[in-house]
Structures are given as structure tokens and as C-alpha cells.
């Protein structure tokens, strides 16, 4: 199930690139973020697929003055939510301003910058490991849009339908 994306882009930009990391049948073990005072510049992922580490393409320019690596404790830790802010006005550089990642055990961030000219978003994916990946767009100024994939549960929980025995 595709959720989002949220964000804004510069209508004058001619180099918007769509990206999609939701087709993998793997789990994210690391997230790499380049960011600065203007917001989130790029995002990249490392997946565990078939017992091997696979690095995604970098989505956005590597131009922020700060860089962070989020290391998830695979296979015990998984993403349960993402939230952040994006610039709400049409202008130069209206890209993703901040991101925060929630897992079943921790919270990472916020990374980037916060401000009163930003709109906020939050995707809460529940307590189960239902996260299926990210998608979005970027251009030369940074990450423009971001969204997530949710893998809905496919197995019903067991319900005890047995009747209690009566005692005399």
C-alpha cells in the first residue's frame, strides 16, 4: 500500500527525479542522510536482502554540511513511523526540511531544520513490522517529496473460541 508522498517542489525545477525503494523484499539496516540548515539534501538506504547487504542509489545531492548514519539493530529493530516538515510556500528551495524516524525500539532525529513556515506530516505504521519501503522525488536542491509503503498484515490473529467447561 503506497502512502504519500508529502512535500513541495520548485515549479521552476526541470530536473525532478522520481525514486522508489518499495519494491525490495528486504529490510532496511541503515539510513544515510545528508542535511543542513536548508533541510534534507539526500537520503540513501542499506537493505538486507537474501542474507546480503545491498546499498540503494543516493536520492538527492550530497551537498549538506551534516551527515548522519542511522543504524538499525537488524533483524530486531524495524521502522514504525516517519515524520517531518516541508516548506509550505512556493519558492526557491521548497524541499523537505526535517525528518524523524521511529522504530519499535528507538526514535532517530529530527534531522534537518524546523520552522514556522513549514507544514508537518506524520506516517504512523503501527507496532508490527509492516513497513515496506520509501518513495519520493528530489532535484538539485534536495529531497522534495517522501512517502512510505505499508505491507498490511496478511495473517489473522488467532482468537480463542473455546468454551469454558462448566463446573458443578
From Swiss-Prot:
GO cellular-component term (any): cytoplasm
Matches recorded under InterPro entries: Jacalin-like_lectin_dom (IPR001229), Jacalin-like_lectin_dom_plant (IPR033734), Jacalin-like_lectin_dom_sf (IPR036404)
Top-level taxon: Eukaryota
Paired cysteines (S-S): none
Subcellular location: Cytoplasm
Location of the Jacalin-type lectin domain: 1-152
UniProt-listed SUPFAM superfamilies: Mannose-binding lectins (SSF51101)
Any GO BP annotation: defense response
Pfam families tied to this protein: Jacalin
GO molecular function: carbohydrate binding
Keywords from the UniProt entry: Cytoplasm, Lectin, Plant defense
Keyword match Cytoplasm: yes
Role: Unable to mediate restriction of long-distance movement of the pathogenic tobacco etch virus (TEV) without causing a hypersensitive response or inducing systemic acquired resistance.
Family: Belongs to the jacalin lectin family.
Oligomeric and partner information: Self-interacts. Interacts with RTM3.
Protein's UniProt name: Inactive protein RESTRICTED TEV MOVEMENT 1
Gene source species: Arabidopsis thaliana (Mouse-ear cress)
Gene of this entry: RTM1
Amino acid at each position: 500500500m503506497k502512502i504519500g508522498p508529502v512535500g513541495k517542489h520548485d515549479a521552476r525545477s526541470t530536473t525532478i527525479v522520481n525514486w522508489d525503494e518499495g519494491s525490495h523484499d528486504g529490510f532496511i539496516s541503515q539510513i544515510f542522510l545528508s542535511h543542513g540548515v536548508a533541510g534534507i539534501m539526500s537520503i540513501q538506504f542499506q537493505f538486507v536482502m537474501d542474507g546480503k547487504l545491498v546499498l540503494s542509489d543516493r536520492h538527492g545531492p550530497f551537498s549538506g554540511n551534516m551527515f548522519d548514519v542511522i543504524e538499525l539493530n537488524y533483524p530486531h529493530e524495524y521502522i514504525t513511523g516517519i515524520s517531518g516538515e516541508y516548506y509550505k510556500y512556493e519558492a526557491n528551495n521548497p524541499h523537505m526540511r526535517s525528518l524523524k524516524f521511529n522504530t519499535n525500539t528507538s526514535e532517530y532525529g529530527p534531522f534537518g531544520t524546523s520552522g514556522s513556515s513549514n507544514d508537518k506530516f506524520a506516517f504512523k505504521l503501527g507496532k508490527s513490522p509492516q513497513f515496506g519501503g520509501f518513495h519520493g522525488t528530489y532535484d538539485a536542491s534536495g529531497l522534495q517529496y517522501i512517502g512510505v509503503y505499508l505491507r498490511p498484515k496478511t495473517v489473522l490473529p488467532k482468537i480463542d473460541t473455546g468454551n469454558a467447561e462448566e463446573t458443578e
